[in-house]
């Protein structure tokens, strides 16, 4: 994937990617000298792709898009709807000039059946990702599968599970997307997920244990960075902290209280902390 260096999830400034949100978020990302941004495609058809592309080009900023599937298009039970939803999102990603569509592209945030995943669910997901990868290839887009914690989804919780799905599909334009917040819950150790996914890992969310300011929780940052350095990671390092969320997103992520004072606290303290660690371990 062509995205490298340090980026930030634009939830730091907005979860509504309209023209105003795009202008504010991109201006802020430029201010903090980010290499790329991650844009949440909560409503892909409504995004003014030409406007976003012009802003990205103007500021020479790269972008990745991300999403979780709505219940009406959960891949495990509604594969045809998921294929169509991802087709629209992939097209919008390409039109915006972004290089990848990642996140919970296999299911929904909050999708749980109450029982372990079934072979039928995984077969449906593989079918969806196969179709999506073929369409993404025609648009020059890569796809990322993000392993998320058991409370948000029951299907892919660890780096190894993400690898298993990617190898099941067998498409070379799908990569593993890890997240330190989820890893801190699901992996035996932070390094385990990174080592398990090393052949496919191209993108990682750097998110604190409470989703707040990095460096002020209990994520084992030295272990994380040491493992990334050990595998020669050269993908995207994306800081993710949820400050501005609409109620439906807060519900899906189970965030019920402020996790940081404001964006200045996260960008002023958390970002330098993460960048300094990355420099310490030779990642940037």
What are these regions (language model features)?
Residues 1-10, 14-30, 57, 97-99, ...:
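Histidine-acidic metal/acid-base catalytic patches
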Residues 19, 58, 78-175, 185, ...:
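Active-site acidic/histidine proton-transfer and metal-coordination neighborhood
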Residues 12-14, 41-43, 69-72, 107-110, ...:
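Active-site-proximal loop/turn and secondary-structure-junction residues that shape catalytic pockets
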Residues 48-60, 128-136, 193-196, 223-228:
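Catalytic-core regions built around general acid/base machinery
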Residues 23, 35, 39-127, 234, ...:
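Structural motif corresponding to the early beta-alpha repeats
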């Amino acid at each position: 994937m062509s995205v490298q260096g340090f980026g930030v999830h634009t939830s730091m400034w907005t979860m509504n990617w309209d023209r105003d949100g795009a202008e504010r978020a991109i201006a802020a990302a430029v201010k903090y000298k980010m290499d790329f941004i991650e844009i949440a495609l909560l409503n892909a058809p409504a995004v003014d792709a030409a406007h976003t592309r012009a802003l990205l080009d103007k500021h020479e900023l790269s972008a990745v898009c991300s999403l979780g599937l709505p219940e009406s298009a959960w891949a495990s039970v509604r594969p045809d709807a998921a294929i169509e939803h991802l087709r629209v999102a992939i097209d919008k990603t390409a039109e915006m000039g972004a290089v990848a569509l990642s996140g919970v592209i296999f299911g929904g945030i909050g999708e749980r059946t109450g029982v372990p995943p079934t072979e039928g669910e995984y077969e449906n997901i593989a079918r969806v990702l196969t179709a999506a990868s073929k369409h993404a290839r025609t648009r020059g887009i890569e796809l990322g599968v993000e392993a998320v914690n058991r409370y948000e989804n029951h299907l892919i919780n660890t780096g190894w599970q993400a690898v298993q799905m990617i190898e099941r599909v067998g498409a070379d334009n799908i990569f593993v997307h890890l997240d330190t917040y989820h890893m801190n819950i699901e992996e035996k150790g932070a390094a385990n997920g990174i080592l398990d996914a090393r052949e496919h890992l191209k993108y990682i969310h750097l998110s604190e244990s409470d989703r707040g300011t990095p460096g002020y929780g209990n994520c084992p940052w030295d272990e994380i960075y040491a493992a990334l350095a050990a595998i020669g990671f050269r993908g995207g390092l994306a800081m993710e902290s949820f400050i501005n969320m609409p109620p439906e997103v807060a519900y899906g992520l189970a965030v019920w209280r402020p996790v940081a004072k404001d964006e200045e606290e996260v960008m002023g303290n958390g970002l330098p902390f993460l960048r300094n660690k990355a420099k310490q371990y030779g990642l940037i």
